[in-house]
Amino acid sequence: MKKILAIAPHTDDIELGCGATLHKFKDLYQIDTIGITSAQPLATGDPIQEFYEAMSIIRANVTFLGYTPRILNEQRQKLLDYFWNLNKKNKYDIIFCPSSYDHHQDHQIVYQEVFRAFKHSTILGYELPWNNRTFRTDVFISVDEDDLDAKIKMLDCYQT
């Protein structure tokens, strides 16, 4: 079976950026996901648990790394080493990560290290409109109402 890796600098980024697309592919690919950081759990919920619940909707394997948000630049080499070793073990066909046009500092670091480690895979960047000053796309993937409903269910897992 072919493999997809979806990477979230923060626990809700996958759902927002490519949740419907991953739902579309859930029966065709093994989907692995990585949550790199999370905000501290708030009184209304636990973002790490919410991430696991959301990813269960697309039957994804989940890894949470537990890095601190907004200082990923201090962990660049660790991230690169982690991604490099993961790529050697798994040889993913498609990688979803933040777009190269994303201006959030954590998203930029993740994109850059993903690009270095997985340069022989297809890398598709997802966009979060509030982080991008421009909209530039090379790939559109059609999703249906069922995929969109699944994305909404994934987002509904979050109380935080």
Where are these regions (language model features)?
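Conserved short-loop catalytic and cofactor-binding motifs
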Residues: A39, R70-I71, P98-D102, V139
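The feature marks non-catalytic terminal segments
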Residues: K2, I57-A60, N90, I94, ...
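Active-site rim/loop-helix segments in enzyme catalytic domains that contact anionic ligands
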Residues: M1-K91, F115-H120, D146
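Short beta->alpha junction loops/turns
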Residues: H10-T11, S100-H103, D144
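Active-site adenylate/phosphate-handling loop in enzymes that bind or generate adenylated species
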Residues: F83-N132
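Short, flexible active-site-adjacent loop segments at beta-strand->alpha-helix junctions, enriched
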Residues: T37, T68, S100-Y101, P129-N132, ...
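Short aromatic-enriched loop/helix-cap "lid" or pocket-rim segments at secondary-structure transitions
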Residues: C18-G19, T44-P47, Q108, T134-V139
